[in-house]
């Protein structure tokens, strides 16, 4: 049975064609704010129900509850603030109850917002609670500290879609739910990734697939830290893996356009909620899910799920997988009795170093077809000037 949306109803904040025309005619009169790409894609995520039950950016009550209790003000589990930051100068003529136009970086209006509340926030308090650190080297902390002085909350209505370079990999929740039903999948396991797949990922996915009907591989495309794989590399690598090593009727590959927050445990629950909205009944939570550096304990992202028995999606906790030459394949500590001399630990960092040196990782770490797909790219990793 496809999972019900979080909160019971799939949000739709996309304007009808008639309403779009009306709004477009009104936009010229409204205060306009230009938002960066990561905010713009989250406007779309709200509108298309990926962030259900949110209908807009958080007002202070929901924001405070999420920050302190990891729940919305109605007690529904929700672990990460979804906020719109603004400069006081941008909204100097705006008061609560007004409408404003949200423009993307191309200066094209993408949505209107009904302003419910404008409020101040404490960036340090936000960062400490969300990321468990104030270290400026943490990418989420660094990004938070650069945000603007005020937050503005209220419902949004989408009037224009963004440019989407990954159109052929894009499915909205309303579409995945139809697709899963057409496939007659009653149980669907979601997999979040920001990496190209190695054998450890494949092992975990196939282990989950053995007792569910379908696997939903949902790579995150959007803002990530330098050194992470580029979006197009991840998609090419997964396409190669699925083509050569997965039963074609058991897997759906589609992107999630949003930013990585690197919020570890909180983000693991957030990722599970989003996949529930796509229709997943189960969600794979690996070691150090959504982690970065050493800010979180290895299995902290699994332990947090104990606080959410009412989440409505079943987390699947997996231990680290490795290649055992004695077993002759990929295994985990739970099923392999052999000493370390037989084990090849799969390090994502080590694989990235090999690829940077244009060296093909060995088949005990990564499928050759996947490695070849990655090495076709001259620069497979993100860099920011």
Segments the model singles out, each with a brief description of its role:
Residues 1-385:
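Active-site cores that bind ATP or allylic diphosphates and position pyrophosphate for catalysis
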């Amino acid at each position: 049975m496809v999972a019900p949306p979080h909160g019971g109803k799939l949000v739709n904040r996309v304007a009808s064609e008639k309403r779009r025309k009306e709004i477009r005619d009104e936009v010229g009169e409204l205060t306009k704010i230009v938002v960066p790409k990561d905010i713009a894609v989250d406007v779309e995520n709200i509108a298309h129900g990926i962030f259900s039950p949110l209908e807009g950016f958080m007002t202070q009550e929901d924001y405070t509850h999420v920050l302190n209790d990891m729940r919305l003000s109605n007690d529904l589990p929700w672990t990460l603030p979804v906020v719109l930051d603004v400069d006081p100068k941008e909204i100097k003529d705006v008061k609560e109850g007004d409408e404003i136009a949200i423009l993307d970086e191309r200066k094209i209006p993408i949505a209107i917002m009904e302003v419910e509340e404008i409020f101040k926030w404490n960036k340090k308090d936000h960062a400490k609670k969300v990321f468990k650190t104030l270290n400026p080297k943490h990418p989420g902390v660094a990004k938070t500290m650069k945000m603007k002085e005020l937050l503005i909350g209220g419902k949004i209505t989408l009037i224009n879609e963004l440019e989407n370079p990954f159109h052929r990999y894009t499915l909205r929740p309303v579409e995945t739910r139809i697709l899963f039903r057409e496939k007659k999948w009653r149980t669907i396991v979601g997999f979040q990734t920001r990496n190209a797949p190695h054998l450890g990922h494949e092992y975990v996915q196939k282990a989950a697939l053995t007792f569910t009907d379908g696997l939903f591989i949902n790579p995150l495309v959007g803002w990530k830290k330098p050194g992470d794989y580029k979006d197009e590399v991840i998609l090419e690598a997964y396409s190669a893996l699925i083509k050569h090593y997965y039963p074609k009727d058991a897997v759906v590959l589609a992107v999630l356009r949003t930013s990585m927050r690197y919020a570890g445990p909180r983000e693991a629950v957030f990722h599970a909620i989003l996949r529930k909205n796509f229709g997943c009944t189960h969600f794979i939570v690996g070691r150090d899910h959504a982690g970065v550096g050493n800010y979180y304990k290895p299995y902290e992202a699994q332990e947090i799920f104990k606080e959410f028995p009412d989440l409505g999606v079943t987390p699947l906790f997996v231990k680290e997988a490795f290649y055992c030459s004695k077993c002759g394949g990929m295994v985990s500590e739970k099923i392999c009795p052999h000493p370390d001399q037989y084990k090849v630990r799969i390090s994502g960092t080590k694989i990235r170093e090999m690829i940077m040196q244009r060296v093909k990782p060995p088949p005990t770490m990564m499928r050759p077809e996947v490695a070849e797909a990655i090495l076709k790219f001259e620069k497979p990793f993100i860099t920011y000037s």
